[in-house]
Amino acid sequence: MARVKNGIVHVARRKRILKKTKGFWGTKKSNYKKAKDTLRKGMMYATRDRKTRKRDLRSLWIVRISAALTGMGINYSRFFEGLRKLNIKLNRKILSNLAIEDIESFKKIVYEIKN
């Protein structure tokens, strides 16, 4: 029986892993064994952090809205209660952008809620 060395597949597999680890630091980009482990760990972090990014952004929006409301004499919970009562359908992301970029529109919304 002939010996099968599997050379082309072997090289292609290593090349694929090393291509994905381009930009990593030290031997983690050039040593196949370390590159493979680092890449696997990086993919795990990427999967986990796609979930946490959503939580982080939501909390950032809440902090921004709260910060904008403190100078206007209303707190966050009263603000959102007023939004629901007036049936204003703006989400936290939009409100956060309004509070930063278009403060006059945000003040008008707060004025409507207060009165």
Curated annotation (Swiss-Prot):
GO terms for biological process: ribosomal large subunit assembly; translation. HAMAP family: Ribosomal_bL20 (MF_00382). Keywords: Ribonucleoprotein, Ribosomal protein, RNA-binding, rRNA-binding. The keyword rRNA-binding applies. Pfam families: Ribosomal_L20 (PF00453). Belongs to the bacterial ribosomal protein bL20 family. Gene3D superfamilies: 6.10.160.10, Ribosomal protein L20. GO terms for molecular function: rRNA binding; structural constituent of ribosome. This is Large ribosomal subunit protein bL20. The keyword Cell wall biogenesis/degradation does not apply. The gene is rplT. Binds directly to 23S ribosomal RNA and is necessary for the in vitro assembly process of the 50S ribosomal subunit. It is not involved in the protein synthesizing functions of that subunit. One of its GO terms (cellular component) is ribosome.
